[in-house]
């Protein structure tokens, strides 16, 4: 920019007033080279002497530089880009005094960086520091007193040969200049390190049983870590490396104390982990809990695609990769130059910060479109939004949580992510079947002890005990049974339940699942996840259902995600099995248990007798026999047909189950006479309640009159006693005789008075032991009071 300078019109100027004229190399180098008889000459090596001789020879015949007159570089000033030389010294050329007073054109005054490295005059323009000590008087006047003293000290050191020069740099190349006592301190330090290494490599010796650690002193973590490695090595080959007289329990006890000290765990949780993992895997698990898990994102496919989201975040300075082949929407973040939870994409709802293990339960649930799904413990809403994402905002999702404060985060996340098919509720999950049920699928992320997320919450290491584990397990059992009751087994597309926890203890996982298999009509099905370790079917003294192999466990040291447990159930019946199978309504329809079926008891609480069982069996046989064209009706325990006379059903059944055969033909004749008299009476009477059912306080001669008539369903389910087999033939014969007598027309049967019913030898209730015995007096009185009404008008 600006006007171009015309070099022809530039005035020529000579050297400055303070410019120092540099003398030849023969005078400049003499000051630094020692004299021939000087003692300091012995300090120079052979190579240094050769280089000094070359300088002396070169300083005698120095060719005159081919340089334009008038150019002179001021000492103490360097052109832009030039570096003052510290290595090899080059003798300055002898300058002509006549040329010092002449000056070249303006273009020659400018020295570029390319001229310094590529031009032939670069050595001539370079300023050396050989004459730094011989400053002019004007320069010394500008220096401070302390600077003058420093210059004098430097000059004295130069004369003594201590000044830095290139000969000092060549001492490492010479073998003659190294003294044997050059590095005494380094040798001592190396010897000390070697001694420490020798001490560390000593064999591990288990301390005596009664000896304890020194109180009041902080443990040396390096020694503790070394001892842990030694104990693990001994336990791997215990038979060969153990000390004589020491048991495995002593080594394990010492290892537990060292692990608790080194990793800051409580004794209870560490003992649980030692029961769960082998020793080598235990160390890996403890080390993995000291490192945080990688940050993972879940793409919200309701608003964007994973490819587009990844490109936007990469442009913002986020280093990320796809989460894995098992996930189509996950991204893992390695590092970021922007806060990953405050980007415009996050605020717009394009992604959700969610752990990798939290995506697995929703993938195992596999929700379908247009379904009714329940998320029983939904806060903070990550799994709920993922379910809505897979359902494409169709169907209905009921998101429930017992903590009202945590529901605020659920509302915020669902609004931000654009979820529109979710209803939020605040109920206790244990009472949820009373609120609403009939869901196609249910997801239960039960509250747990959090032993799988120690990297997020290190306080779990010390603040958990046996009571906390048992309390969580009891709550999980209640929630799981409630969730199973909320599932509809008759769903065409569903009937599934996924149970998951962020804990790795057996008490909160396999134990709870095995309990649910015994209490409800469910079975375990595969989760559909291609990776993960199988659940335990046996753990120490416990034995679980073999189908627990289909459950999945995830650990931080093997899968690089939070510890998790996932189980998937399929409900095949909405009924609830009971421990006592007496209730027919609660019995399982698929597998009815008839062996434990109990016959109904009598009203007075006594056990049913053989005769009562025979009566039930006879009634069952009567129901199976083909009846006549005219149907029979049952009213108040009396089977009647229109225009026909009948007798009470229970006494007939009792008569048919007589164990003896002494009556013979006499019983048949008495029956015929009795039936003929009943035909002549006309309208039938209805016995009162007092006559039908005797009071418990007044014992009746009719022993089985108080036995209630069982229902048809109970009759079908009742077992057949073996002792009633011979009496069934008699019952069939007598029943046929009754039907033949009943089919005879009743001509001229005049109705009698009600009082006449109690009189006469043929009473409606007959004792099973004697067919001619009259009824008791109390029953006769109750029947004559006029309470009974005729059955036929």
Swiss-Prot record:
GO MF assignments: RNA binding; rRNA (cytosine-C5-)-methyltransferase activity
**Catalytic activity annotation:** a cytidine in 28S rRNA + S-adenosyl-L-methionine = a 5-methylcytidine in 28S rRNA + S-adenosyl-L-homocysteine + H(+)
Sites where Phosphoserine occurs are at 59, 68, 179, 649, 713, 767, 782, 793
**Cross-link Glycyl lysine isopeptide (Lys-Gly) (interchain with G-Cter in SUMO2) - where?**
72, 257, 601
In which residues is S-adenosyl-L-methionine bound? 377-383, 401, 428, 445
Residue numbers of N6-acetyllysine PTMs = 634
Biased composition range(s): Acidic residues: 98-110, 118-128, 165-178
List the active site: 502 (nucleophile)
Query: Where is the sequence biased in composition, kind Polar residues?
Result: 599-609, 654-668, 784-793
Q: Which Gene3D superfamilies match?
A: Sun protein, domain 3 (3.30.70.1170), Vaccinia Virus protein VP39 (3.40.50.150)
Which residues does the annotated region (N-terminal domain) include? Answer: 1-355
Record EC number? 2.1.1.-
* Compositionally biased spans, kind Basic residues: 10-22, 44-57, 671-686
Query: Which InterPro entries does the UniProt entry name for this protein?
Result: MeTrfase_RsmB-F_NOP2_cat (IPR049560), MeTrfase_RsmB-F_NOP2_dom (IPR001678), NOP2_rpt (IPR012586), Nop2p (IPR011023), RCMT (IPR023267), RCMT_NOP2 (IPR023273), RsmB-like_ferredoxin (IPR054728), RsmB/NOL1/NOP2-like_CS (IPR018314)
GO cellular component term of the entry, any? nucleus
* Modified positions (Citrulline) in chain numbering: 86, 148
Protein's job:
S-adenosyl-L-methionine-dependent methyltransferase that specifically methylates the C(5) position of cytosine 4447 in 28S rRNA. Required for efficient rRNA processing and 60S ribosomal subunit biogenesis. Regulates pre-rRNA processing through non-catalytic complex formation with box C/D snoRNAs and facilitates the recruitment of U3 and U8 snoRNAs to pre-90S ribosomal particles and their stable assembly into snoRNP complexes. May play a role in the regulation of the cell cycle and the increased nucleolar activity that is associated with the cell proliferation.
Kindly provide the name given to this protein in its UniProt entry: 28S rRNA (cytosine-C(5))-methyltransferase
Q: Which organism is it from?
A: Mus musculus
């Amino acid at each position: 920019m600006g006007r171009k300078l015309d070099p022809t019109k530039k005035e020529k100027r000579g050297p400055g007033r303070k410019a120092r004229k540099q003398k030849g190399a023969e005078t400049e180098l003499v000051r630094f080279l020692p004299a021939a008889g000087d003692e300091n000459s012995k300090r120079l090596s052979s190579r240094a002497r050769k280089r000094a001789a070359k300088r002396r020879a070169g300083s005698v015949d120095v060719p005159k530089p081919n340089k334009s007159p008038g150019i002179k570089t001021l000492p103490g000033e360097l052109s832009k880009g030039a570096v003052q030389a510290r290595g090899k010294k080059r003798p300055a050329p002898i300058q002509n005094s006549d040329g010092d007073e002449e000056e070249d054109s303006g273009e020659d005054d400018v020295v570029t960086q390319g001229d310094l490295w590529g031009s032939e005059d670069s050595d001539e323009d370079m300023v050396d520091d050989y004459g730094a000590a011989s400053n002019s008087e004007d320069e010394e006047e500008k220096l401070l007193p302390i600077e003058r003293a420093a210059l004098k000290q430097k000059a004295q050191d130069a004369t003594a040969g201590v000044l830095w020069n290139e000969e000092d740099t060549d001492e490492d190349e010479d073998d003659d200049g190294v003294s044997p006592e050059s590095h005494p301190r380094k040798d001592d330090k190396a010897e000390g390190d070697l001694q420490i290494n020798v001490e560390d490599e000593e064999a591990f010796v288990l301390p005596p049983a009664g000896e304890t650690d020194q109180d009041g002193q902080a443990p040396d973590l390096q020694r503790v870590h070394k001892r842990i490695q030694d104990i693990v090595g001994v336990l791997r080959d215990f038979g060969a490396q153990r000390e004589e007289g020491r048991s495995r329990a002593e080594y394990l006890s010492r290892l537990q104390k060292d692990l608790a000290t080194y990793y800051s765990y409580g004794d209870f949780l560490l003992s649980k982990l030692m029961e769960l993992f082998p020793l080598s895997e235990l160390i890996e698990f403890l080390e993995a809990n000291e490192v945080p898990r990688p940050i993972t994102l879940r793409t919200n496919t309701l608003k964007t695609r994973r490819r587009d989201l990844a490109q936007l975040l990469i442009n913002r300075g986020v280093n990320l990769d796809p989460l894995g082949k098992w996930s189509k929407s996950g991204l893992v973040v390695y590092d970021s130059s922007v806060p990953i939870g405050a980007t415009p994409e996050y605020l717009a709802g394009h992604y959700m910060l969610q752990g990798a293990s939290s995506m697995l339960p929703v993938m195992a649930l596999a929700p379908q479109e247009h379904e009714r799904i329940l998320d029983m413990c939904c806060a903070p809403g990550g799994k709920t939004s993922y379910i809505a994402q897979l359902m494409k905002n169709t169907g209905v999702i009921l998101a429930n949580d017992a903590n009202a404060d945590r529901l605020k985060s659920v509302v915020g996340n669902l609004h931000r992510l654009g979820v529109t098919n979710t209803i939020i509720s605040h109920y206790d999950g244990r009472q949820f079947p009373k609120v609403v049920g009939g869901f196609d699928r249910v997801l239960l992320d039960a509250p747990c002890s959090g032993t799988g997320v120690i990297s997020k919450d290190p306080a779990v290491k010390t603040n958990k005990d046996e009571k906390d584990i048992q309390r969580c397990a009891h709550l999980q059992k209640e929630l799981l049974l409630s969730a199973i009751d909320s599932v509809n087994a008759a769903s065409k597309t569903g009937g599934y339940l996924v149970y998951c926890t962020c804990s790795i203890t057996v008490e909160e996982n396999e134990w709870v699942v095995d309990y649910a298999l015994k209490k409800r009509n469910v079975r375990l099905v595969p989760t559909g996840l291609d990776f993960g370790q199988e659940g335990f079917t046996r753990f120490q003294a416990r034995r679980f259902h073999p189908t627990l192999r289909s459950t999945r466990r995830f650990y931080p040291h093997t899968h690089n995600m939070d510890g998790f447990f996932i189980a998937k159930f399929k409900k095949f019946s909405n009924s609830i099995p009971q421990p006592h199978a007496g209730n027919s309504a609660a019995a399982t329809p698929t597998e009815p248990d008839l062996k434990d079926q109990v016959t109904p008891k009598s009203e007075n609480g006594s056990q049913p007798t053989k005769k009562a069982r025979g009566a039930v069996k006879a009634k069952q046989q009567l129901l199976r026999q083909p009846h006549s064209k005219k149907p029979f009706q049952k009213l108040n325990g009396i089977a009647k047909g229109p225009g026909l006379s009948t007798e009470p059903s229970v006494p007939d059944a009792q008569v048919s189950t007589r164990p003896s055969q002494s009556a013979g033909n006499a019983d048949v004749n008495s029956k015929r006479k009795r039936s003929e008299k009943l035909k002549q009476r006309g309208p039938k009477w209805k016995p009162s309640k007092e006559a039908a059912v005797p009071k418990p306080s007044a014992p009746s001669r009719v022993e089985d009159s108080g036995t209630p008539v069982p229902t048809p369903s109970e009759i079908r389910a009742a077992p057949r006693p073996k002792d009633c087999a011979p009496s069934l033939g008699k019952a069939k014969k007598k029943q046929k005789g009754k039907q033949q007598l009943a089919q005879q027309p009743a001509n001229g049967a005049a109705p009698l008075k009600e009082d006449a019913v109690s009189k006469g030898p043929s009473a409606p209730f007959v004792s099973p032991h004697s067919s001619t015995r009259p009824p008791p007096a109390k029953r006769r009185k109750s029947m004559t009071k006029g309470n009974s009404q005729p059955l036929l008008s």
